[in-house]
């Protein structure tokens, strides 16, 4: 048995709301938005200019190198590298070939850990199939983990199919769940919460099993959950959702996706840090202005240390948490 295939123990999970209970104005509005988005995406994608615009966006994709200063308690994580992919929106102009090329580029960076920040698909569950070939390109030693975003939950249905597909393809789902990872002799707690707008996030469940003082990384699709994270001694929160505004005019986004201005980049609250990625894909229109797509590459850095790769130390792995059972 490979050391990258861990034994997992229950820590907490999201209990999805039955489809039959999701009635009323909110459900109808969600479906209207989903259908409208899908229709506009497909119509534009059929036009040559739609594909041309999307190709321009993908050529602008950048890997953003980031360094996270480590607190003394986290010094053992020095040199750990994390690739964070958010808002792929598979099916929204993003086809299987695009995704495979993007994932191959991620693999070439040799991250120790790959994290997905939600909105892997756009409006339909069958868009998951577009991810298959790309996911086969990735095999980070500490594994791959994901949380759902609002687009993954647009239909208000059980996320069992979404979860089981990802698990089948090597991605563990952290939906109000946490796992313990070991790297270079040090441990840290990796956890994720449900989407803030379409789901039922519960950080208490996600942190169940965390040891006192243990370094903690949180995945939350929506950045506005950062206040909860900062109040719970979370060292690093990784979020997406905003697309960096997707369209910015004079440095400002006409459409706001965060009530607190968490549009892109670093934010700090006490000892807790948040990074909001601009994401990889687009939705509705294949246009990005002053908000190029990005894949952050986060390197943990202890003060006074050189960031040198330690290949032999990247293979340790143990987890606690259970996210591989489809609901």
Please place each PLM-identified region on the residue numbering:
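Binuclear metal-dependent hydrolase catalytic cores centered on His/Asp/Glu-rich metal-binding motifs
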Residues: 156, 163-171, 178, 183-220, ...
């Amino acid at each position: 048995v490979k050391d990258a295939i861990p034994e997992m123990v229950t820590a907490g999970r999201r209990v999805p709301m039955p489809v039959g209970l999701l009635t009323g104005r909110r459900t109808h509005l969600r479906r209207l938005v989903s259908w409208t988005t899908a229709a506009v995406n497909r119509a534009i994608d059929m036009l040559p200019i739609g594909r041309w615009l999307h190709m321009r966006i993908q050529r602008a994709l950048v890997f953003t190198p980031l360094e996270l200063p480590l607190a003394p308690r986290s010094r053992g994580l020095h040199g750990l590298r994390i690739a964070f992919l958010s808002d792929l929106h598979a099916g929204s102009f993003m086809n299987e070939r695009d995704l495979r090329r993007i994932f191959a580029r991620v693999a070439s960076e040799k991250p120790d850990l790959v994290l997905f920040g939600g909105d892997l698909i756009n409006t339909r569950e069958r868009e998951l199939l577009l991810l298959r070939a790309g996911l086969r390109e990735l095999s980070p030693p500490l594994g791959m983990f994901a949380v759902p975003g609002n687009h993954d939950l647009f239909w208000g249905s059980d996320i069992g199919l979404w979860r089981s597909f990802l698990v089948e393809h090597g991605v563990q789902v952290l939906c109000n769940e946490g796992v313990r990872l070991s790297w270079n002799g040090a441990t840290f707690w990796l956890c994720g919460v449900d989407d803030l707008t379409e789901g039922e996030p519960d950080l208490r469940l996600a942190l169940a099993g965390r040891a006192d003082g243990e370094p903690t990384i949180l995945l939350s699709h929506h950045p506005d959950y950062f206040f909860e994270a900062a109040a719970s001694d979370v060292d690093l929160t990784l979020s997406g959702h905003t697309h960096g505004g997707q369209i910015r005019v004079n440095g400002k986004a006409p459409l706001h996706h965060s009530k607190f201005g968490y549009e892109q980049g670093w934010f700090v609250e006490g000892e807790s840090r948040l990074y909001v990625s601009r994401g990889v894909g687009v939705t509705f229109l294949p246009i990005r202005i002053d908000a190029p797509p990005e894949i952050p590459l986060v390197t943990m850095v202890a003060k006074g240390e050189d960031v040198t790769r330690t290949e032999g130390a990247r293979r340790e792995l143990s987890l606690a948490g259970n996210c591989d059972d489809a609901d």
